[in-house]
Amino acid sequence: MGMLSEFKAFAVKGNVVDMAVGIIIGAAFGKIVSSFVGDVIMPPIGLLIGGVDFSDLAITLKAAEGDVPAVVLAYGKFIQTILDFIIVAFAIFMGVKVINRLKREEAVAPTAPPVPSAEETLLTEIRDLLKAQNRQP
């Protein structure tokens, strides 16, 4: 029973739950970026290059024979994957940059000095009176 309670304590920690949410959102974001690159970015680029569909770009190493599919280097899909990565990396970079800026602003925000208590105020007045008495001839 000890292992189960340890696992439960581990699983409900804030960091683990936050990480799980981040992974799920990251996977969904990856799908959105893949669709954006494949369906929005690549078609105009292919059109500018001369009507090329990047997902079909490949070098056939061995032609298909019977039931055996062809062996190809699908470099067009690789180019799309590289663009996916660049967009995701840039989005993460910008997010981290914003978070770091917010953290710096929080750290720099001046805090008001604490109001001295009545006892501290009284002690300060006594100190000032003693200093004044010591200065008099």
Curated annotation (Swiss-Prot):
InterPro entries: Mechanosensitive_channel_CS, MS_channel, MSC/AndL, MscL_channel. One of its GO terms (molecular function) is mechanosensitive monoatomic ion channel activity. SUPFAM superfamilies: Gated mechanosensitive channel. This is Large-conductance mechanosensitive channel. Homopentamer. Keywords: Cell inner membrane, Cell membrane, Ion channel, Ion transport, Membrane, Transmembrane, Transmembrane helix, Transport. It is found in: Cell inner membrane. Its main location: membrane. GO terms for cellular component: plasma membrane. The gene is mscL. It is a multi-pass membrane protein. Channel that opens in response to stretch forces in the membrane lipid bilayer. May participate in the regulation of osmotic pressure changes within the cell. The chain crosses the membrane at residues 9-29, 79-99. Belongs to the MscL family.
